[in-house]
Amino acid sequence: MKIVVYHAEECDRKKCTSLKLGRKGKFKIVSSLNQLPRGALVLNPFSEKAVSPEDRDMVLRRGIAALDCSWKKVKKSSVIFQTARNHRSLPFLVAANPTNYGKPCILSTAEAVAATLYIVGLKDIASDIMSYFKWGPHFLDLNRELLEAYSRAENSLEVVEIQKKFIGG
Ligand SMILES: C[S@@+](CC[C@H](N)C(=O)[O-])C[C@H]1O[C@@H](n2cnc3c(N)ncnc32)[C@H](O)[C@@H]1O
């Protein structure tokens, strides 16, 4: 499984989830956009299209790419979000990492990648990624009902419908 993270060097390196997974050999950390895998699913919080089980083949064959930068600095115009295709945002999920605990959609890179893997049906790999953090398994437990529902959707539109019903109560 190719998981490649473009690292913008804006974070506290001790707290950075992608650098930790890079050290464990789970993520490849790159500093040049040319090193991102072609055709990968790009995790972009500004994308209008949501991750769905339809993306499974793309994830298996091409991998996942993410941008690790400060949430304070991330912008629609961030360079990685301009260059690649196949951008996806994650539907409503709540962060469990200590920096943004309880905040919807403001996920760490590790949480975003694990959620993507879960939704496309690669649940064991999602659990493995989360197992490197004390709070990681809690992220999956906290969001289990929604992650399960998203993982049973047909496509991105259905994922958005599930999200709407959940937020609307
Ligand atoms: C802004 S960085 C923050 C990383 C943080 N410093 C850490 O240690 O994990 C998080 C990245 O994860 C992905 N991500 C997080 N939440 C997302 C969402 N709701 N939709 C799509 N991608 C998301 C994006 O690639 C985003 O740039």
Swiss-Prot record:
InterPro entries per the UniProt record, alphabetical: Tsr3-like, Tsr3_C
Molecular functions per Gene Ontology: 18S rRNA aminocarboxypropyltransferase activity; S-adenosyl-L-methionine binding
Covalent S-S links between cysteines: none
Enzyme class: transferase
UniProt keywords, alphabetically: Cytoplasm, Ribosome biogenesis, rRNA processing, S-adenosyl-L-methionine, Transferase
Localization per record: Cytoplasm
Record field: catalytic activity: an N(1)-methylpseudouridine in rRNA + S-adenosyl-L-methionine = N(1)-methyl-N(3)-[(3S)-3-amino-3-carboxypropyl]pseudouridine in rRNA + S-methyl-5'-thioadenosine + H(+)
Protein name per the record: 16S rRNA aminocarboxypropyltransferase
